[in-house]
From Swiss-Prot:
The gene is fluC. It comes from the Bacteria. This is Fluoride-specific ion channel FluC. Belongs to the fluoride channel Fluc/FEX (TC 1.A.43) family. Keywords: Cell inner membrane, Cell membrane, Ion channel, Ion transport, Membrane, Metal-binding, Sodium, Transmembrane, Transmembrane helix, Transport. It comes from Azotobacter vinelandii (strain DJ / ATCC BAA-1303).
Length: 124
C-alpha cells in the first residue's frame, strides 16, 4: 500500500506543478483571461481521465499504483474545481455575467465531451 500512496503523492506533485506552470504561462501572456488556465487544465484533465479510464478497462492488469498515481495523483493535482469556482465568482463580481455563464457552461459541457472523447480514443 505504501507504493500506491507514494505513486499518488508523486503524481499529485507533478500534476500541481504542471497546473502552476500553465497558470503562470497563460497569466503572463493573457492576464485579462485569468480563467483560461483553469479551463485548459480541466478540459485536458477530462480528456485524459476518459482516455485512461478506457485504457484501464481494456487492461485490468495495469497495477493499482500506476492507475492511482495517474488518476487520483496526477489528474487530481492537475485539475481543480475550487479554482474553477473562484474564477466564475471573479467574473460575476467584475460584472461579466455573460462570460461567467459561458465559462461555466463550456467547462461542464466541454469537460463531459472531453471525457467522452478520451474514452472513444481508447477504441481507435
Amino acid at each position: 500500500m505504501i507504493g500506491v500512496t507514494l505513486a499518488v503523492a508523486v503524481g499529485g506533485a507533478l500534476g500541481c506543478l504542471l497546473r502552476f506552470a500553465t497558470s503562470n504561462w497563460i497569466s503572463a501572456h493573457w492576464p485579462q483571461h485569468f480563467y483560461a488556465a483553469t479551463l485548459a487544465v480541466n478540459i485536458a484533465g477530462c480528456l485524459l481521465i476518459g482516455y485512461l479510464y478506457g485504457q484501464f478497462l481494456l487492461r485490468p492488469e495495469v497495477p493499482l499504483a500506476l492507475r492511482a498515481g495517474l488518476i487520483a495523483g496526477f489528474l487530481g493535482g492537475l485539475t481543480t474545481f475550487s479554482s474553477f469556482s473562484l474564477d466564475t465568482l471573479r467574473l460575476l463580481e467584475s460584472g461579466q455575467a455573460p462570460l461567467a455563464f459561458s465559462y461555466l457552461a463550456f467547462s461542464v459541457l466541454g469537460g463531459l465531451l472531453a471525457t467522452w472523447a478520451g474514452l472513444i480514443l481508447t477504441k481507435l
